[in-house]
Amino acid sequence: MEFVEDMRKIRNRKSLYVILFVLVAIFINGLNSNIETTKYDIYDHRVKQEMKVVFIADTHSCKYGEEQEELLQKVKSEKQDLILLGGDIIDDELPMQTGFDTIKDLAKSYPVFYVTGNHEIWSGKQEYIKRKIKSLGIEVLEGNIKEINVKGNLVNILGLEILR
């Protein structure tokens, strides 16, 4: 009988270790905030001069190095002409200021356009977020089209808002 009891303790301990391992793996995966880049070359006969656009989305108020330096250096290294922010820059659970820190320096050097993502809406502070982003010098597109000139190319940018 003692042998059976010892085997149960070992099995319970193994189960505990497996559960603990799975929880740690899930936690570590949740902390993954690596920067992924994908490059596309798009050709169109209407484009007079080559231009480079950087699209940033789903940063979710994560930290990318001290004062967001890792992300900012990555963006600046692209030598882009235009930056589009595709939503979920601000998270509905993490501190908003980290998200604002991610984008505040971008508008100083480049034309930047922003659309709201679902996490900004889920925060319940969508209007505050849009006002704050506008105050950083970033154009917020709210279902409107903006025509801009990029290196002699007329570009129309449409920002669609997600409805609740």
PLM features: residue spans?
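N-terminal membrane-anchoring alpha-helices
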Residues: 1-47
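A generic structural signal for ordered alpha-helices
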Residues: 18-20, 53, 111, 153
